[in-house]
Amino acid sequence: MSQAPAKTTDETSTVDIDSAVEAILGAIEQEREREIITRRFGLYDRKETLEQIGELLGITRERVRQLEKAILVRLKIASDEGKIPAVQSVEKVLIRELSEMGRLATVADLTKALLGDKATPLSRARIAFAATLAPRLTVINENDNYKNAVGIAEYGDEKKLMKQVDAVVAGVKKHGQPLTIEELHEQLDHEHPSHVRALASVSKHLSNLKDLWGLNKWPTVNPKNIRDKIYVILLEKGSPMHFSEIADSIKESDFSRKDVTTQAIHNELIKDKRFVLIGRGIYALDSWGYSKGTVADTIIGILKKSSEPLHRDEIVKRVLKSRQVKETTILLNLQSKPQFKRVAKATYTLAEEK
């Protein structure tokens, strides 16, 4: 079986995108119309609002909107009729790339796939502009729910793709906790997990961390502060950790802004109710069932639950289930604290309150 030819530099270089955009702009006869398009799409600098362009050109923002719409309609018709070859060239490259990315991708991911480290905000803007004019591509415009994305038109228009993205978000919500793309794919009616991943990537309501996807508000996939990062580290470890070990794990993680001090970690562990101190500098998640408070508090809780006095060995055994402390510390508490009363050899109960 013959292998597909590797991509050449000419096929995906920044120069090709730049040349294509210049060729497209060359199809716009009036300079003022070119000005509107370049500024609205940010083809040479940052994107500008209708109002900003209107002030520059001395026309109303509504007039700018009308002109932009009319220009794009003309360009799309010309592209559809094959009169702007540059659009067809870019379209061909984008469709080939999208076919490998699940038929849909954010403009940021698509540009990175094409240009690698050469991807810039300017190249993203130019690819998005060219895609807008390509008849075989669908563009999802950015808003509060969706990222700017490009899809293969054969598989859906903007409305259909948005609906599919919404279905992925609904699937995550229904599951109620982070899950892998493969698990999500089993819940949804799509041909391949890569398409589910592509749809999930377009939503502004989802985040992913270490191959797990979930809602933005879930700290396990979108840790926003030090406390959330501590929570994720402990959850991944699955067992109690010393605060210095937690700090080291955060520094070695894939988190953004992971330059933290050991003291900062310790301070956050103390403040957050999700974390329980169970030994000297050792913390666990509250959800694991470890008890809070002092060793004496833990012993009191154990004796209160018991219907009869307990032997010290049994007390030690039960304390160690919820605390990481030395056995001698437990015995010292039993022998020295006034809350406990020995009723037989090595057997204790709670002292009667006076």
Region annotations inferred by a language model:
Residues 1-354:
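C-terminal non-catalytic scaffold/interaction domains in large multidomain proteins
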